[in-house]
Amino acid sequence: MCYNTCNYWGGIMEFKNRKHFDTYLNGLEFLGQGSQGTCYLSKKNNLVVKVFNDYFDNEETGYTEEFLLRFSNIKNNTFIWPNNTIKIENTIVGYTMPYKRAKNLCNINPLSINLDSLERAALNAEKDIKLVTDNSVKLYDAIYNILYTNGKLYIIDTLEYRIRKVSYEENRMMMDEELMLFLVDSYFDDFVNNDKLLKEMYRKSEVRGVDFLKTFRNKLSEYVGKDITKLNEAKCLIKKSSRYKYMRGFY
């Protein structure tokens, strides 16, 4: 029972009415709001509760349980699928998903991150991208939806993914692009643009993000005369720019 107002079993969290659901939400921690809805944290269950914007606008969402949970059987360590639906009087108003104690990549200072850990995380994520590709899942809008913590990457907001034949490279490209932007944009643009190989690799759709990370790290290490593990070890090469492409959560 959730505040004695809902039933919670299997794939459904069901509330009696809007008043009871709003009371339940008031007991959760607000996480953030996006184009699709608002997220809350249930610390008790270690769950993210995502409520569609349609609920707050008093409109029907139009989603079915089958659609929301369509990828939940693809077991992996990277993609955070919806695992339960939320209903009020048999109307779906949102879903739940496992909570991961991680930060959005765009809110992390790139200078402080361990490059070995980041590379390991990207390699593991690649395996899961291959897995979902083999299951005919087409990724969509992954940029700004990648979380990171201690050598692990997670990808959230998978609602707009589709069942469609797609190449592994096309699916991986979304992670590749954000990885490159995270490492370079508004910090090392001049360094990259002044190096022929890095300039050719940077943000090219056919370039693997992990390969760019390795090459970028090697080039920085050569310049500063030692093998760097964090970008702040090459801070002498930073030229901050206000003309950025990657929207970071700080500047």
List each language-model region with its residue ranges.
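Juxta-kinase regulatory segment immediately upstream of eukaryotic protein kinase catalytic domains
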Residues: 2-29, 59-63
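Catalytic phosphate/metal-binding cores of nucleic-acid and nucleotide-processing enzymes, i.e., regions
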Residues: 5-6, 18, 26-29, 36, ...
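ATP-binding glycine-rich loop module of kinase domains
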Residues: 24-85, 109-111
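Protein kinase-like catalytic core scaffold
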Residues: 47, 78, 95, 154-157
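Well-ordered, non-membrane alpha-helical segments in soluble/globular domains
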Residues: 59-68, 119-123, 172-178
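Conserved structural core of kinase catalytic domains
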Residues: 76-122
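Conserved kinase catalytic-core helix
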Residues: 108-148, 153
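C-lobe/activation-segment region of protein kinase-like
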Residues: 150-251
